[in-house]
Amino acid sequence: GIEGMFLPMDVGSDESILAAFSVASAQVERIDVLVNNAGVLLDEGKTLVNVSWEVLHRTLQINSLGSLQVVRTFLPLLSKGSRIIMVSSAAGVITGGVSSFAPAYALSKTLMNTMTMHLARDLTPKGIVINSVSPGWVRTDMGGAGASRSVAKGAETPVWLAVDAPESLTGKFWYDLKEIDW
């Protein structure tokens, strides 16, 4: 069977990431699937001109840079056949123009997609697969009760990427089991 481990951590804190790594490395020698699902939405209704520097910095730290630090820290537990899932958002899509929705959030998700491409280039020679995925607007704490998607529907593509997707598919952005030009 499949065994999972949930490691809560504050991805805005290097100490918290290192503590989570210590817990994981004490329990397992290898991670098959690493899911980066951290995210904050702090700037709804703002513009890039009027969002505070603190909110912009915190959003980038949590939504993108923290996820990068998790990958870098957990790399010793990843090996050939391991998969990394970066939970992103359609807000990070810049094809056809940038989103007017929550600019700090959108920037952070565009950065996550770009990091995914860079990491794929770096990790492919090691046999590690990485992709970013938009689960859509999901009924979670962030999405709220009015969101259009169930948690199960939002998890469909991340689970496919983690378990069934061909290993040749790496460095891409996905939504509803389809590669998205972002």
Indicate residue ranges for each PLM-predicted region:
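Hydrophobic structural elements of the Rossmann-like NAD(P)H-binding subdomain
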Residues: 35, 85, 130-133, 143
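The beta1-alpha1 cofactor-binding region of Rossmann-like NAD(H)/NADP(H)-dependent oxidoreductases
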Residues: 8-19
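C-terminal helical subdomain
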Residues: 125, 132-133, 144-182
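A glycine-rich helix->loop->beta "capping" turn
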Residues: 2-5, 23-36, 42-44
